[in-house]
Amino acid sequence: MLHYKRILLKLSGESLAGEDGYGINAGVLDQYAEEISEARDMGAQIALVIGGGNIFRGVSQAAANMDRVQADYMGMLATVINSLAFQDALERKGVFTRLLTAISMEQIAEPFIRRRAIRHLEKGRVVIFGAGTGNPYFTTDTAASLRAIEIEADIIVKGTRVDGIYDSDPEKNANAQFFPDISYLDVFHKKLGVMDMTAITLCSENSLPIVVMNMNEKGNLSRLLRGEKVGSLVHHEGV
């Protein structure tokens, strides 16, 4: 019995770069695709949002002298590149997928239509959402929250390279405090940087829980779906 039937998995573009620091690491891509394939085989309905920071970040130093709107559109295109790579990796494992983009790209993807996305999920396809929200000034974290609410996901899973939420970077501070369970309000007040404030607000207002977990730990996604305690859970206090 699955603890979560329909999930939205959010991955950063940087995570796809692995140790390379830039671009797409084939080994990481294959590992993540394998994790998603196993979760899909358990009967979970899985949607995916991937950032584009391994290729281009609209708020980066490289874009400092660019028009912000132009830079954000470049970032959206970067997410589509990652989405196409992920689609290929999944389909090589026999997983049926659909790529839906917020900006029309009819030669390579379907336009985002909510009912169509839900129907794909019901048919067992992994749905990848590309191009963010299609609007500048909104992050892929916000896109993930929005899409998760639209498809009525049970939870957002944010895959990272650390075990969950800490009060400081555990890769730099060995004494960082781990939060296995935390409220949306505490995420705000402690400024923990789980997601941007717009994304957290959307989740809070729609009572959509968030799990932050280590995507590099093999089997974590499957364990989470079975109801095992994995990573950090963000939810309403007392729930």
Curated annotation (Swiss-Prot):
Q: Where does ATP bind?
A: 10-13, 53, 57, 160, 166, 169
Inhibition and activation profile: Allosterically activated by GTP. Inhibited by UTP.
Query: Recorded GO terms, molecular function?
Result: ATP binding; UMP kinase activity
- Pathways per UniProt: Pyrimidine metabolism; CTP biosynthesis via de novo pathway; UDP from UMP (UMPK route): step 1/1
Q: Chief subcellular site?
A: cytoplasm
Q: SUPFAM superfamilies from the entry?
A: Carbamate kinase-like
Q: Which domain of life is it from?
A: Bacteria
UniProt keyword list? Allosteric enzyme, ATP-binding, Cytoplasm, Kinase, Nucleotide-binding, Pyrimidine biosynthesis, Transferase
Q: What is its EC number?
A: 2.7.4.22
| Disulfide cysteine pairs (residue numbers) | none
Tell me where it resides. Answer: Cytoplasm
Q: Which enzyme class, named as a word?
A: transferase
The annotated region (Involved in allosteric activation by GTP) lies at 18-23
| Annotated signal peptide | none
Keyword Magnesium (UniProt): no
For this record, an example GO cellular component is: cytoplasm
Per the UniProt entry, what are the Gene Ontology biological process annotations, in alphabetical order? 'de novo' CTP biosynthetic process; UDP biosynthetic process
Positions annotated to bind UMP: 52, 72, 133-140
> Which reaction(s) are listed as its catalytic activity?
UMP + ATP = UDP + ADP
> What does this protein's UniProt record list under function?
Catalyzes the reversible phosphorylation of UMP to UDP.
> Self-association or partners: how does it assemble?
Homohexamer.
Family (UniProt): Belongs to the UMP kinase family.
- State the protein's name: Uridylate kinase
Q: Which organism is it from?
A: Chlorobium chlorochromatii (strain CaD3)
Gene name linked to the record? pyrH
